[in-house]
Regions:
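Glycosyltransferase donor-sugar binding loop
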Residues: 40, 229-245, 259
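Membrane-proximal helix-turn-helix segments that form the acceptor-binding/catalytic region
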Residues: 94, 138-165
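Nucleotide-activated donor-binding/catalytic signature segment of Leloir-type glycosyltransferases, i.e.
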Residues: 244-262
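Aromatic "clamp/platform" in nucleotide-sugar-dependent glycosyltransferases that forms part
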Residues: 281
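Short hydrophobic beta-strand element within catalytic cores of glycosyltransferases
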Residues: 298-301
């Protein structure tokens, strides 16, 4: 099968980009031919960061010039710029090689699905919500709904073309089913199993440095537990560089921050840590949580979203207010390392991910 993977922005190096790489790797192992439609990005850096050496040498690259200063992902300006560039690249491929695809696999935002008469699979994270003018309950809400109406109609049209949504958690699936009302299946992302090392009194967190991750709370907790070491491993987002710099400036004496760590460094810290602390509320899934658990870290996560599905029973702890966290860290330190966490992490292995994805593809009629 010839599969067109659409992931407009790969430079974020977050969970979505990781899942895109996993999807490409899986489809290649199934024997499919993969073309990646994206703006130009540093393929070697991405391969090193996620540990997929030579991955992009095995795909057909359909890259267009980078779009700088044209708005954020999902904005009208960003959509117009990318969709126009995608259309030109697809037209070139068709004109010069007569190339035809069997399937479109959108691994980022549904708004970027190209207008092609093909079946569409969409990785499902979280649906965008636009208020309908018919449901506006105030003049201000009505004005806002009218302003966003063109974008709302654009997304409605794109979503209507999706044949199957692959939701990355039951939390995501529930919201996607409610808003999109498209056929869906639950497919947890594949996670690496990290070998535990010699443990020390280390608390670690891993995230893309954006405000929604609430990483400043990590330092707040660190100041309340000066006897432990705290390490923050972050990927810098080009749109939020000031946020990451601010985090480094306010790091406490017992805290350190590492920017854009290599895969080996990332695994080393997970292997040595006793506790993994996750600050975000309503996270869609949480690959780094699972990988920390595989290294026998005890996870402490907010009692919401995808992490609530991951961390259950004796596999870790869930918090509702930040005041609960320091005592949870003490408890986790006493009980480390956690065999229960490692056992639970194995439910989200790459092997299980590929088996689930293969099962879905085997049922498709293209």
């Amino acid at each position: 099968m010839r599969v067109l993977i659409v992931h407009p922005v790969m430079k974020f190096l977050g969970g979505g980009e990781r899942l895109c790489c996993e999807t490409i790797h899986a489809l290649l192992s199934f024997g499919h031919e993969v073309t990646l439609l994206s703006e130009i990005f540093d393929t070697q850096r991405t391969e090193r960061f996620f540990g997929y050496s030579g991955l992009f040498d095995k795909v057909i690259p359909l890259f267009y010039p980078s779009t700088r200063k044209v708005g954020s992902l999902g904005s009208s300006a960003h959509l117009i710029r990318h969709l126009t560039s995608q259309k030109h690249k697809l037209r070139e491929l068709s004109n010069f090689q007569g190339y035809a695809f069997d399937l479109v696999f959108s691994t980022q935002d549904a708004g970027y699905i190209p207008d092609m008469n093909l079946p569409v699979i969409q990785w499902g994270y979280s649906p965008r919500f636009f208020l309908s003018p018919l449901h506006a309950d105030s003049p201000r809400a009505l004005a806002s709904a009218i302003r966003w109406l063109p974008l709302r109609l654009h997304y409605l049209r794109k979503v209507s073309r999706i044949g199957l949504v692959l939701a990355i958690s039951q939390y995501s699936k529930t919201h996607l089913d409610e808003v999109w009302k498209r056929p869906s299946a639950l497919v947890y992302p594949g996670c690496n199993m990290v070998n535990p090392g010699a443990k020390r009194n280390l608390v670690v967190t891993v995230a893309r440095a954006v405000p929604v991750k609430r990483l400043e709370l990590f330092w707040k907790v660190a100041m309340l537990r000066p006897k432990y070491e705290f390490a923050m491993l972050v990927t810098q987002d080009p749109n939020f560089l000031e946020y990451s710099i601010a985090l480094s400036r306010v790091a406490p004496m017992n805290g350190r921050i590492l920017f854009n760590p290599s895969k080996d460094t990332y695994h080393k810290f997970l292997g040595e840590a006793k506790v993994y602390l996750h600050m975000m509320e309503r996270e869609h899934f949480g690959i780094s949580i699972v990988e920390a658990m595989s290294a026998m870290c005890t996870p402490i996560v907010h009692d919401s979203g995808g992490p609530k599905e991951i961390v259950c029973g004796r596999a870790g702890l869930r918090w509702q207010t930040i005041d609960e966290v320091p005592s949870m860290i003490d408890e986790a330190m006493r009980n480390a390392p956690s065999a229960a966490a490692r056992q639970r992490a194995q439910c989200f292995s790459i092997e299980r991910f590929e088996k689930r994805l293969a099962s879905i593809f085997s049922q498709m009629r293209v």
